[in-house]
Amino acid sequence: MSGGLDILSLKEDDITKMLVATTHLGSENVNFQMEQYVYKRRADGVNILNLGKTWEKLQLAARAIVAIDNPSDIFVISSRPIGQRAVLKFAKYTDTTPIAGRFTPGAFTNQIQPAFREPRLLVVTDPNTDHQPIMEASYVNIPVIAFTNTDSPLRYIDIAIPCNNKSAHSIGLMWWLLAREVLRLRGTISRSVEWPVVVDLFFYRDPEEAEKEEAAAKELLPAPKIEEAVDHPVEETTNWADEVAAETVGGVEDWNEDTVKTSWGSDGQF
């Protein structure tokens, strides 16, 4: 698929990421249509995927995505919780439409319901859990790209990307690699420059583990310093209320000392 071009070949850094994320580890069961992607079978029964074919199918999927003129017509779907964050991040950087969580039945076939959509391409995380949108896409002739494990059914799937779709790190890495390849083909980022978006942003995080990490981080913080209270001397002040009362009492005249005279008579008699 790389056409002999070294710039399109799988780099050692990407191979290391795949091995660390266990992308090459399949399941113990193998679908007969997935046998072509199996490299070897270990002694414990786990099948090993061929990462070279994984990279070729990922490039093919990226070219199919870039061929769509309007990116919002591409729907990226994940019913499994481990792929929902990766789907949202992929949609953010590639301007596609995400469906993270439960898929509404009839969204592609029932034109009466408000949630009816007409996508031109689907990208799903797991054919087993996302079987409903894949089935509806087959009714209306929508091509489907899927991340498939060794035991995944390939019915109604046009482009299968073999990988470990049961691991949170593996599925996050595959969505990250697909997003990077799409942006490279669009010319948004250069192949000679490393994409600044780290792959950790695509990994699923358990809410309980995140709370535990936050609690542990708070415990490591130093305790706030408490300043000791200092007693400051209080200046003696005079009671201003007593002074005002004394001045008021001393300055008031006795109103009853003078005889009240009227103007009705000269000697004050009626």
UniProtKB/Swiss-Prot annotation:
SUPFAM superfamilies reported in the protein's UniProt record: Ribosomal protein S2 (SSF52313)
Compositionally biased tracts (Polar residues): 261-270
Region annotation Disordered: where it falls in the sequence: 251-270
Chief location: cytoplasm
Pfam families referenced in this protein's UniProt entry, alphabetically: 40S_SA_C, Ribosomal_S2
Localization annotation: Cytoplasm; Nucleus
Single GO molecular function: ribosome binding
Subunit details: Component of the small ribosomal subunit. Mature ribosomes consist of a small (40S) and a large (60S) subunit. The 40S subunit contains about 33 different proteins and 1 molecule of RNA (18S). The 60S subunit contains about 49 different proteins and 3 molecules of RNA (28S, 5.8S and 5S). Interacts with oho23B/rpS21.
Protein name from the UniProt record: Small ribosomal subunit protein uS2
